[in-house]
Structure formats: structure tokens, C-alpha cells
Amino acid sequence: MPFLRHLALRCRDMERSRRFYEEVIGFKFVDYRPSRQGLDLSDGVNNITILQHSAVERPVFEEGNEYIHFGIIVEDLEAVWQRLHAWGAMFSRDDVKQRKPIDPHVLPPRSFKVLDPDGNVVDITGYREEWRGVELPALA
């Protein structure tokens, strides 16, 4: 069976994206790419490569119309929620399955959608069984 282990995201400001995914979401910084035009982050299993992109800004898509989005399971949903608020993140939807409008002042009980610095939709959940067929290692 194949295993997804890598995702690459183009960004307008590589260091800002690094701070978002490392300090706010909780990924670990691995290293810069040899060209210094990219960097790698990891959760220990999956790798996210952040690539500096100098093209004209792309439009931010409304949730549900984006080309791609991805989901992250976190150990402490409330802590991530608080860091996202401190960051000034834009929240998109309450509950990744029901996609209800969100009240950005009320922590959803299970999951939510947020935009990264480049407008990518990121599903955030504290529920380990959020996505069918996903088996996670035991928490340390």
C-alpha cells in the first residue's frame, strides 16, 4: 500500500508560512532546501515543503471552491485555537464535516477550518477518528 508522506505548498512569504505551520500549528522545522528557496517541516511521519513563490498573488478561494485543502489532527485543539487567534488567523467554517458558519469567538467542540497565510484552507481537528481509514500512532 502506498503512503502519503509529502505535501508541497507555494507561498508568498516562506518565513511567515514557516512560523504559521511551526509555531501556530506545531510542525517541527527540518531544514532549508539546498537552494534556500524552500524549507521542510514534519510531524515525524509526513513532510510539508514550503516553497517560495514569486509570482503574482493568487486569489483566495472561498471554502468549498478551493483547488485543494488538507486536514491536520492536533493533540490540543484549544491550544491551537488560541495560537491561531494570537496569530490573527482567518477562520472559515465550524466543523470540517458539517461546514457550518463559524463564530470565531467560540471554540468548536470538534473541528474547524482556517486559512493559512496564503489562503489555503486547512482543516484542524482534535478528533483522532475525523477521517475514515486513518490510523494514527499512539500519542507519546
Task: Describe the role of every protein-language-model region.
Residues 35, 66, 105-108:
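Exposed loop/turn and edge beta-strand positions of beta-sandwich/beta-sheet ligand-binding modules
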